[in-house]
């Protein structure tokens, strides 16, 4: 990014209350307007410091800033995907080539759903469960990432569907019962978006 190329908070493609009753408006508003906004603001500030360190030739400083870039940049990347993976018209099953690929790589849609649910529920502490595409091998893979580690930068997989299992994504509604949140989120996942991502990278 050149100077003045700042990251900005993307608009949600729906209202804060649109995913009710599965994810309530209070969670969506805080998650988007506070949590995601903070990642964007902090990413911009960190990139500015990083550019200054590079300009000074200060290798120590720019190495020291890399974990912050990964965390804040990952937070921005991950949430930007997450919002578009969700829709009030979500739920159901994918169709066409994505469904065929899911059946090929996981046996059935239900088996895939069970597997991604188990991986997401099993994340220790904060993190994400992902459906990704392994371009080299030409197949779908499920992976978990810690904290805000971005899927592609961490595993090389291209992100298709992300499930945020940070407590801020569900605690106000589901308390400490992460499996209940996972059960609910399948009702608002939009397979159209996941399919678009799949078709664009395969």
UniProtKB/Swiss-Prot annotation:
Required cofactor(s):
Mn(2+)
Transit peptide per record:
1-5
Entry cofactor note text? Binds 1 Mn(2+) ion per subunit.
- E.C. code: 1.15.1.1
Give the UniProt entry's GO cellular component terms. Answer: mitochondrial matrix
- Output the SUPFAM superfamilies linked to this UniProt entry: Fe,Mn superoxide dismutase (SOD), C-terminal domain, Fe,Mn superoxide dismutase (SOD), N-terminal domain
Q: Which residues carry this modification: 3'-nitrotyrosine?
A: 39
Q: From the Swiss-Prot or TrEMBL record, state where the protein is found.
A: Mitochondrion matrix
Modification N6-succinyllysine, positions: 49, 103, 111
- What chemistry does it catalyse, as a reaction equation? 2 superoxide + 2 H(+) = H2O2 + O2
The positions annotated for binding Mn(2+) are 31, 79, 164, 168
Residues with PTM N6-acetyllysine: 49, 95, 103, 111, 183
| Alphabetized GO MF terms | manganese ion binding; superoxide dismutase activity
Maturation and modification = Nitrated under oxidative stress. Nitration coupled with oxidation inhibits the catalytic activity.
Per its UniProt record, what Pfam families does this chain match?
Sod_Fe_C, Sod_Fe_N
In terms of superkingdom, the source organism counts as: Eukaryota
UniProt keywords, alphabetically: Acetylation, Manganese, Metal-binding, Mitochondrion, Nitration, Oxidoreductase, Transit peptide, Ubl conjugation
- Name the family the entry cites: Belongs to the iron/manganese superoxide dismutase family.
Subunit record text: Homotetramer.
Function of the protein: Destroys superoxide anion radicals which are normally produced within the cells and which are toxic to biological systems.
Protein name, per record: Superoxide dismutase [Mn], mitochondrial
According to its UniProt entry, this protein's organism is Oryctolagus cuniculus (Rabbit)
Q: Which gene encodes it?
A: SOD2
């Amino acid at each position: 990014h050149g100077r003045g190329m700042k990251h900005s908070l993307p608009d949600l493609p729906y209202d804060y209350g649109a995913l009710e009753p599965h994810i309530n408006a209070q969670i969506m508003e805080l998650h988007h307007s506070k949590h995601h906004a903070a990642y964007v603001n902090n990413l911009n500030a960190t990139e500015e410091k990083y550019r200054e360190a590079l300009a000074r030739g200060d290798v120590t400083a720019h190495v020291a800033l890399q974990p912050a870039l990964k965390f804040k940049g990952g937070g921005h990347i991950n949430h930007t995907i997450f919002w578009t993976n969700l829709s009030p018209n979500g739920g159901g099953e994918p169709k066409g080539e994505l469904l065929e690929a899911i059946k090929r790589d996981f046996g059935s849609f239900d088996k895939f759903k069970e597997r991604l649910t188990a991986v997401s529920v099993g994340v220790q502490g904060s993190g994400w469960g992902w459906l990704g595409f392994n371009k080299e091998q030409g197949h779908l893979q499920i992976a978990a990432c810690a904290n805000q580690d971005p899927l592609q930068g961490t595993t090389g997989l291209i992100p298709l569907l992300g499930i945020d299992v940070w407590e801020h994504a569900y605690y106000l509604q589901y308390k400490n019962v992460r499996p209940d949140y996972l059960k609910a989120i399948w009702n608002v996942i939009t397979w159209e978006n996941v399919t678009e991502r799949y078709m664009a990278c395969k």
